[in-house]
Amino acid sequence: MEHLTRPRSIWPALLHCCLASLSLATAATVDTFELLAQPGHVLLLRHANAPGVGDPPAMKLSDCSTQRNLDDVGRNQAKALGERLRAAGVTNARVYTSELCRCRDTAQLLNIGTVEALPTLSSTVRLTEPERLSQIRALRAFISKLPRDGGPVVFVTHQVIVTALTDNHPDSGGGVILRLLPNGGFERVAEVPAPM
């Protein structure tokens, strides 16, 4: 007599794999932000979602209505990042931001510390190559003077700045965590994915 076996459903196994993957992704995110809670770490964050590219030619720093700004998705991204950071123990960070409104708004919506404008975090898109290089050197010099044993520092900036410092190309609301080195330099230790 031929032995017949009933085919098993793959759904329970598939569900188990999906839940395990989700659990690992959540753990990795929490661990990543816990790095920032350790002394001598910096989060270099691209501003949250602001539809479009660049800014209009008549853009003025003092007038947000002339700039690209966060949309609802961007505001929700910034709030979600702030919640994740606070859950990892980052509650009293030094937060520096580009002067553009989309960065300032992202920094404020994180709600993890006092926000201060830092001009060297502003976009370099409209600068000449010598101006761009000078600004990046000034930002590197600022980072080199941060205390290696200090609390968390967050820089809210633009993709061009993150890329110039780390060769990373984060999506809006994404970034990298840097470890400050004793010699005044830094190294990239983790990527921060943008919240969905």
Report residues per predicted region:
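Feature marks hydrolase-like catalytic cores characterized by long aromatic- and Gly/Pro-rich stretches
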Residues: 164-165
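A short, structured loop/turn motif at beta-sheet edges
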Residues: 146-149, 182-183
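N-terminal secretory signal peptides that target proteins for export/translocation
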Residues: 1-8
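Active-site-proximal alpha-helix that buttresses catalytic centers in soluble enzyme cores
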Residues: 28-127, 133, 168-196
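Generic beta-sheet signal
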Residues: 40-42, 151-157
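A short, acidic, amphipathic alpha-helical segment used as a generic capping/interface helix at domain edges
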Residues: 137-147
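Bacterial N-terminal signal peptides
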Residues: 12-23
